[in-house]
């Protein structure tokens, strides 16, 4: 088996975890107490879901997951919620005091007291796996626990599990709305620390998701539950290939192989379609061509940036439901002829396609309509550099005045770490810029240089 262990860190990570596991349970017919009624052998007893669930002797299915937060309130909601019987109490780990939106507390002072306990629990989960594939790490960039503790954990996982893949699902600070003033500091510090430890990071920006909820689902004031359920659908699409048998199956390492051209350029953009409310879906027939086109609308992306200003390096289309390769090929051919999308010249239009016959599941009473087919597009585009540029700019404004820096230094960080992290991100922006430059021009310039 190719098992995956999910680690949910901090408030954002834990709440995304709730949405994801709720959805996984629905998709696999697992009840909130972990039992799987035997009459529900959908698809003739496919056991691929064991990549995400382990089965106990009593026939109970337990998620291969750990929830960690430095303060107890959010995880307490899991302990008392609908799915309290699903998790083993040891999988829910909480500290006493929170990281107070401070990367240094999450990474150094408070984080280091709990890290060994967390690694011990992860080791127990890993021991139950026959062939551990890697880790999915859910966290936010802006919070203290999400930024500081995640980067600490990833450093330690690299030491303990060397070559195992580590994929991140990270909540990127929204351009307009902010949950903490120091978000830019935390984001840049955590990106710098995890850059070499993460194999692939799917970023999700709250504001982009707010807009999708408002525009496509007509929710006036989206709550975190609305946002997380939408994120859950995306995570589910990305992991569906690991949990179900399909025609074209994709495993974790296969994503990286196809999406990450250079180790540092590992921030694919996720787009999901159709995001549509039940009353609208009733009147529309969403064809493969339509949902494929919708993926190339910047409005449906999970991060605010404009791919029309960037170039694509690679593109994965993950379809699920009633989809046949013929329709997919036709839809992609149409998109290629429109040429609104530009690929870098060193990568001839590479679309990787995965099809999973399990139709998308929706949470009963949720906002999303039940549809016959859906698609999640993962594209590695140079446009995401816009997101880094925005963040770097905010960092610079604050750091120029050394605002709030004393909180970090007081927790044992050195000021040098700030400038080091900022330089690393400047380099990352530069990397993205260079990847998008046409290779032929570059050679011409070098030859010109030799003549003088």
Curated annotation (Swiss-Prot):
Swiss-Prot/TrEMBL site (Involved in polymerization) positions: 452
Sorted UniProt keywords: Acetylation, Cytoplasm, Cytoskeleton, GTP-binding, Hydrolase, Magnesium, Metal-binding, Microtubule, Nucleotide-binding
Chemical reaction(s) catalysed: GTP + H2O = GDP + phosphate + H(+)
Molecular-function GO terms, alphabetical: GTP binding; hydrolase activity; metal ion binding; structural constituent of cytoskeleton
Binding of GTP, residues: 11, 71, 140, 144-145, 179, 206, 228
Keyword Ribonucleoprotein: no
Major place of residence: cytoplasm
UniProt-recorded name of the protein: Tubulin alpha-2/alpha-4 chain
Organism encoding this protein: Patella vulgata
Underlying gene: TUB2
